[in-house]
Design a protein with these regions (language model features):
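Short acidic (Asp/Glu) patches
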Residues: 30, 59-66, 97-106
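Active-site and ligand/interface coordination hotspots across diverse enzymes
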Residues: 1-59
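Short, conserved, surface-exposed binding loops centered on an aromatic residue
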Residues: 35-37, 70-71, 109-112
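Short connector loops at secondary-structure junctions
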Residues: 75-91
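A short mixed-secondary-structure module that forms the rim of ligand-binding clefts
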Residues: 51-73
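Glycine/proline-rich loop-helix segments at beta-alpha junctions forming the active-site rim
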Residues: 87, 93-129
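Catalytic metal-binding/acid-base residues of hydrolase active sites
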Residues: 49, 83, 125
Length: 129
């Protein structure tokens, strides 16, 4: 995703390199990646919509994703979402004029190609799509 309407941010979080790709207004997060072992397999999660996790800090959901990836001996994980709109409440996300985000399909496909395994984890609210 090398476009001028995205912002890519990096951070070293403990043993993990972290990268987040946002829209230029940062109301959308297209992907969040953590890598702690470049040689190991990579796990891709597709979830509902981003909450508060950033390149610097996990939210509770992303923390669970990281723990699962580490427990299953993956060396990295990436989170993409069926809606890129950042909100802690799925009901509010549904009120957004454009909850998917212009570059979200590209981010999901990129994540599927990047990961060795993809987990669909968007729950019941995904029927809104």
């Amino acid at each position: 995703m090398k476009r001028k309407n995205v912002v890519t941010k990096y951070h070293q979080k403990g043993d993990a390199k972290s990268k987040a790709i946002y829209s230029d207004c940062e109301k959308y997060r297209y992907s969040l990646t953590r890598i702690w072992n470049e040689e190991a397999k990579k796990l891709h999660f597709i979830m509902l919509n981003p909450s508060t996790a950033t390149e610097i800090q996990n939210d509770p959901t992303v923390e669970r994703c990281e723990r699962r990836a580490r427990t299953l001996n993956f060396g990295a994980f990436r989170v993409t979402n069926i809606f890129a709109w950042r909100d802690t409440d799925p009901k509010k996300m549904k009120c957004a004029i454009e909850p998917i985000g212009l570059l979200n399909d590209e981010a999901i496909l990129s994540g599927c190609n990047w990961g060795d395994c993809t987990i669909a984890a968007w729950g019941n609210h995904g029927i809104y799509l």
